[in-house]
Amino acid sequence: MTRVGRRSGAAASVAAAADWPEIVALRTRVFVEEQGVPPELEQDAADATAVHVLSRDTTGRVVATGRLLLRDGGTASIGRMAADASVRGRGHGAAVLGELHRQAVLRGVAEVELHAQVTARGFYERAGYEAHGDEYEEAGIAHVTMVRRL
């Protein structure tokens, strides 16, 4: 199923295996090239079991992505949220986040947690997340843990 952003018309859906190269390319552009995250930290073993969601622009190019990692006890974490610089603020990230929430609910998840970059805190607060704890550094970038009940 595809989730469409309320105001933007941006849509998001669960990624297929064939989408993986485009997801990796986007995450590399955003995290490694723009933000200076070491390449060896960008991909990890959790990618193999995660539910990946993506959004495409009008040309069909993957422009936003995120992943859902299921945990025990009806919880999950969301991570690797990335949007191409050309579409930031246009609803693609919100569409991806909404579809990740929908996928979590379908899997019986009641609460999601994420490690938000401090610069994106407002984005997550608008989506119903609350900060928990102090800021900390992850991969050289200031983060804060945020939680939302679904």
Give the role of each language-model region.
Residues 1-18:
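Conserved N-terminal entry element of GNAT/NAT acetyltransferase domains
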Residues 25-39:
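Helix-loop element at the rim of GNAT/NAT acetyltransferase active sites that forms part
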Residues 40-66:
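Conserved beta-hairpin
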Residues 47-49, 72-74, 138-142:
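Short acidic/glycine-enriched loop/turn segments that link adjacent beta-strands
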Residues 54, 61-70, 75-82:
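Conserved beta-strand in the GNAT
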Residues 87, 91-99:
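Conserved acetyl-CoA pyrophosphate-binding loop and the N-cap/start of the following alpha-helix
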Residues 97, 104-117:
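Conserved GNAT acetyl-CoA-binding A-motif
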Residues 113-115, 125, 130-147:
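Conserved catalytic-core motifs of GNAT/GCN5-like acyltransferases
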